[in-house]
């Protein structure tokens, strides 16, 4: 609202209905991803809505980046500064080796592209697997983690590889293997979580070819997860 008033932005009808939950589930009602060049916040706030928020999945990276803008506006800290004492340090992630790219000239973390180690990604996934707890401390709210690891919206229509059409939680994809969810970065940076089997898999790769990440998932299913499912 402050941005809208300051710059007299012409916002589309229905924008006020968008909630953080809609951003987390990629259901903000926009049919396409707003331009992240220039003033991405203004671009987001002036993008028309095609669907009623909460009813239709459409992957929207700019929406996720808006979470960083919200944190900066409300706390005066970027995402990395905000999360360091509340999450990173508590689960053993060294913030010095975690890089969160920023939008140029804004101080806002969230521009697509974070750099983290395989082990640090594993730590975050293990925290989720434990219901948001780490060494007996509730680091992430249990309810948030529980809902994140549930299908909140169908993605059956998504023009993605097969494992992109199995549903979506809170910034987490459901996998074609029932009960399995994943953090999914570019070119196959994965953390797979299987709560029922108390299993986490973290991997880095450079799957740049067509359907490369899907091939990686298929190999994991065929060589590991299918056998575990029978145990």
Task: Please report, for each region that a protein language model flagged, where it lies by residue.
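Conserved catalytic neighborhood of penicillin-recognizing serine enzymes
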Residues: 2-33, 52, 62-65, 116-119
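Structured C-terminal helix/loop/strand segments within mature extracytoplasmic catalytic/sensor domains
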Residues: 183-231
């Amino acid at each position: 609202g402050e941005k809208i008033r300051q710059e007299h932005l012409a916002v589309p009808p229905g924008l006020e209905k968008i909630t953080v939950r809609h951003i987390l589930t990629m259901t903000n009602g926009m049919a396409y991803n707003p331009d992240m060049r220039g003033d991405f916040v203004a671009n987001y706030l002036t993008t028309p809505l095609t669907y009623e928020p909460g009813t239709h999945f459409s992957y929207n990276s700019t929406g996720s980046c808006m979470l960083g803008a919200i944190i900066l506006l409300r706390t005066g800290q970027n995402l990395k500064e905000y999360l360091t004492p509340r999450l990173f340090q508590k689960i053993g992630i060294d913030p010095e080796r975690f890089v969160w790219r920023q939008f140029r000239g804004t101080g806002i973390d969230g521009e697509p592209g974070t750099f983290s180690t395989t082990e640090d990604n594993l730590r975050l996934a293990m925290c989720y697997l434990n219901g948001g707890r780490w060494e007996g401390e509730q680091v992430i709210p249990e309810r948030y983690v529980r809902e994140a690891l549930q299908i909140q919206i169908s993605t059956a229509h998504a023009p993605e590889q097969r494992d992109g059409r199995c549903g979506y939680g809170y910034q987490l994809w459901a996998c074609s293997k029932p009960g399995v969810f994943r953090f999914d970065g570019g070119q196959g940076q994965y953390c797979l979580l299987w709560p029922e089997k108390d299993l986490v898999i973290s991997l880095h790769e450079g799957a740049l070819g067509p359907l490369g990440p899907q091939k990686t998932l298929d190999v994991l299913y065929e060589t590991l997860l299918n056998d575990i499912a029978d145990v």
